[in-house]
Amino acid sequence: MGVKTFTHSSSSHSQEMLGKLNMLRNDGHFCDITIRVQDKIFRAHKVVLAACSDFFRTKLVGQTEDENKNVLDLHHVTVTGFIPLLEYAYTATLSINTENIIDVLAAASYMQMFSVASTCSEFMKSSILWNTPNSQPEKSLDAGQENSSNCNFTSRDGSISPVSSECSAVERTIPVCRESRRKRKSYIVMSPESPVKCSTQTSSPQVLNSSASYAENRSQPVDSSLAFPWTFPFGIDRRIQPEKAKQAENTRTLELPGPSEAGRRVADYVTCESTKPTLPLGTEEDVRVKVERLSDEEVHEEVSQPVSASQSSLSDQQTVPGSEPVQEDLLISPQSSSIGSVDEGVTEGLPTLQSTSSTNAHADDDDRLENVQYPYQLYIAPSTSSTERPSPNGPDRPFQCPTCGVRFTRIQNLKQHMLIHSGIKPFQCDCCGKKFTRAYSLKMHRLKHEVIS
């Protein structure tokens, strides 16, 4: 009769062994090593520590039975981070919270307990750790099939969520696109699925509820007109609108936006950082020039150099009683090729600030001015005169005529002055056909025809 073999496999044997070893440690029996962390003593067994940590295995294997070697100092570990790891070695249960997770992660990395370190990293990346007690219930993750050991996570409200030590992929939170301080604006999207509010008042990261809707929104094509670039010539956005127009548009947007429209705006807003051009520091030095409005006194003083059509319209708009002075920061590149490029960047942004009456009266004049090409290069040089008062924003008169060397504080004045050297007279009277260099002269000439008629 053959020999019969019976094999018994106990699933609870490992847990019972760990429990008994933990009892021996708590009672102080058979403890052969002392761990000192921040002047606090912990008794443990070498075999358990060496089996759990490669750091302790390297330290303890091959040592002689010397009394002084039984005390091991851990200088780069805190008590708050070491106690959960010691409990994990004897119970296979890791208890962490928002207060000690940083210390536990640092201690696990130092002690070469990489499975625990990856678990802490997954907790920090997940949204479970940083949710408030008033938020939705935390999702519990299923235990891994290969590793049956579980990690208990203690949240702020005291609930424990079992998570496998392997910490499978947790649903990632969608990062919120944060604009720069100069471009930071209030952006509100009303959606029935997941309302999101991104504004300057919110400092905590917002989480979108539905990841499927986010993927669907990302798959939609992005409108090139809405995905605005971050920098414009001379700091002027060509889609800038008056304050009243912006308020009216925001009111219409918040009333009843469609689902597709809201989803498209979320996709455009999230992708704004990806479209941001990154330039190395020091590639191009920009000269910052603040354009101030012309007061009534300055207009009378500069009769010898009247303003152009665009600036006269801007001055008329700004001198209306009750209107606020409009100021714009211009970034003038020293590498600008010609005045024509400068004129395109400025004149395309200025008509949005003009009044309705001035736009209708001088629309033809603006078209003539935009079609003029100036064969002169813009020369911006620092002031060399010792008598001029230094300015914190740069030279007081950064714009210099390349023909006669006269300096101006405003680029519009330089363009008007250069028309004299070029001999171009783009402004023509509709009644008599007489041509003028400046729009102001044409405007005064038209008054004569109006008086005669």
From Swiss-Prot:
GO terms for molecular function: DNA binding; zinc ion binding. SMART domains: BTB, ZnF_C2H2. The keyword Glycoprotein does not apply. A zinc finger (C2H2-type) spans 399-421, 427-449. The modification Phosphoserine is found at residues 135, 159, 161, 165, 191, 194, 199. Residues 31-98 form the BTB domain. One of its GO terms (cellular component) is nucleus. PROSITE patterns: BTB (PS50097), ZINC_FINGER_C2H2_1 (PS00028), ZINC_FINGER_C2H2_2 (PS50157). It is found in: Nucleus. Keywords: DNA-binding, Isopeptide bond, Metal-binding, Nucleus, Phosphoprotein, Repeat, Transcription, Transcription regulation, Ubl conjugation, Zinc, Zinc-finger. Residues 145-157, 352-361 have a biased composition (Polar residues). Residues 135-157, 241-266, 295-324, 336-366 are annotated as: Disordered. Residues 304-318 have a biased composition (Low complexity). The modification Phosphothreonine is found at residue 200. There is a cross-link at residues 4, 290 (Glycyl lysine isopeptide (Lys-Gly) (interchain with G-Cter in SUMO2)). It holds the Pfam family zf-C2H2. The keyword Zinc applies. This is Zinc finger and BTB domain-containing protein 44. It comes from Mus musculus.
